[in-house]
């Protein structure tokens, strides 16, 4: 049994279908919209759902917005992705989204993905920018990076209810406070170097010879429209009321 965990909304979505909310393509354009979800009523609703899964949810962190890289060309429109083999995580909604964009989504572990990128067995991948930098993907031929912000992946801090029941109230409060502090620091770290007024990480990536393409709102909408059937399909799986509540929260945050 695991006592405490920090999990990705992507990794836990097979067990908790509502967590696919964050993987809806182009749900929120920026961190402000994500904050409106994880710090508002939607976040509380998701915590209530998680509470029924045998865990006590403590805090939301962030793994980052997943951006797109490849070894072939700049991606500015869905047509640029046609036929490209893109390594994705093993999630059905990702398969649907990249298939809708004309790509060839390829599921594989991250350990297998890196040599596959190096040999060009796959053309590209999608991950938070911190992963791109830490893994030095520019050395694996990933010379083009597209900032499209198609989904953000929150982290969730939880503790087993079995363990929680054994703790005193003082211990519970201490663990909750520690988790919330760690999550707050994680949110800051996840956005460092890639935010307006602080693009040091992006500059470092560009200095390594990577061509960075930042989609305009108009270009992003073309991708959004192309994946709308996927969005609607998965909204029904997640729960349309929850999705509508999320959309309203994001709109209010603009």
Place the predicted regions along the sequence by residue:
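N-terminal secretory/targeting leader peptides
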Residues: 1-33, 41-44, 48-254
